[in-house]
Amino acid sequence: MSTLKKPDLSDPKLRSKLAKGMGHNYYGEPAWPNDLLYIFPVVILGTIACVVGLAVLDPAMLGDKANPFATPLEILPEWYLYPVFQILRVVPNKLLGIALQTLIPLGLILIPFIENVNKFANPFRRPVAMGFFLFGTLLTIYLGIGACFPIDKSLTLGLF
């Protein structure tokens, strides 16, 4: 059973909306029941089947058993905390390291006020926001990679 709405292109209201880039919900395939009853369960059950199949075919080993009397040389946090760990490790004053980390959300809050343009505009036409984003992304990757190295090689990533 399929219900498909076809557009009535003789309707002047629909034509004016289509000219403005709107009105696309007047025609096409409805989400209920087609997507919600048929496609979503197939995707969900397929994902569960893939995860269970991979878990059965290749079970992950848990690794070595913990020895409370032998600690590693350097304890690293989880991978998503590497950039923060690197900032705290490299900055000589810990209070300054925490202050640097508070600048990140403050900078994100200030971006809309610095570049006051249409929020629906093409992101490539927003050079200040794109510059902040690219700089922040590259800095985060650099700090995350640097956290994996010993502290004497962490700033140069072992290249120099």
UniProtKB/Swiss-Prot annotation:
Domain of life: Bacteria
UniProt-listed InterPro entries: Cyt_b/b6_C (IPR005798), Cyt_b/b6_C_sf (IPR036150), Cyt_b6/f_cplx_suIV (IPR005870), Cytochrome_b_C_euk/bac (IPR048260)
Transmembrane residue ranges: 36-56, 95-115, 131-151
Coiled coil: none
GO terms of molecular function: electron transporter, transferring electrons within cytochrome b6/f complex of photosystem II activity; electron transporter, transferring electrons within the cyclic electron transport pathway of photosynthesis activity; ubiquinol-cytochrome-c reductase activity
Pfam families the UniProt entry points to: Cytochrom_B_C (PF00032)
GO cellular component terms given for this protein: plasma membrane-derived thylakoid membrane
Gene Ontology biological process terms in this record: photosynthetic electron transport chain
Membrane disposition: Multi-pass membrane protein
Key words, A-Z: Electron transport, Membrane, Photosynthesis, Thylakoid, Transmembrane, Transmembrane helix, Transport
Compartment(s): Cellular thylakoid membrane
UniProt function note: Component of the cytochrome b6-f complex, which mediates electron transfer between photosystem II (PSII) and photosystem I (PSI), cyclic electron flow around PSI, and state transitions.
HAMAP family tied to this protein: Cytb6_f_subIV (MF_01344)
Family classification: Belongs to the cytochrome b family. PetD subfamily.
Subunit structure: The 4 large subunits of the cytochrome b6-f complex are cytochrome b6, subunit IV (17 kDa polypeptide, PetD), cytochrome f and the Rieske protein, while the 4 small subunits are PetG, PetL, PetM and PetN. The complex functions as a dimer.
The protein's name in its UniProt record: Cytochrome b6-f complex subunit 4
Organism (species): Prochlorococcus marinus (strain MIT 9211)
Gene name for this UniProt entry: petD
